[in-house]
Amino acid sequence: MIKSDQET
């Protein structure tokens, strides 16, 4: 599993 974080 790939963990990706997005914050805008």
Swiss-Prot record:
Keywords in alphabetical order: Translation regulation
Up-regulation conditions: Expressed in both exponential and stationary phase in rich medium; expression is considerably higher during exponential phase (at protein level).
Entry superkingdom: Bacteria
BP GO terms, sorted: regulation of translation
Comment field (misc): This gene lies upstream of and overlaps baxA on the same strand in another reading frame.
Main function: May serve a regulatory role in expression of downstream gene baxA; in a baxL-baxA-lacZ fusion mutation of the start codon to a stop codon in baxL increases expression of beta-galactosidase.
The protein's name: Putative translational regulatory protein BaxL
Species whose genome carries this gene: Escherichia coli (strain K12)
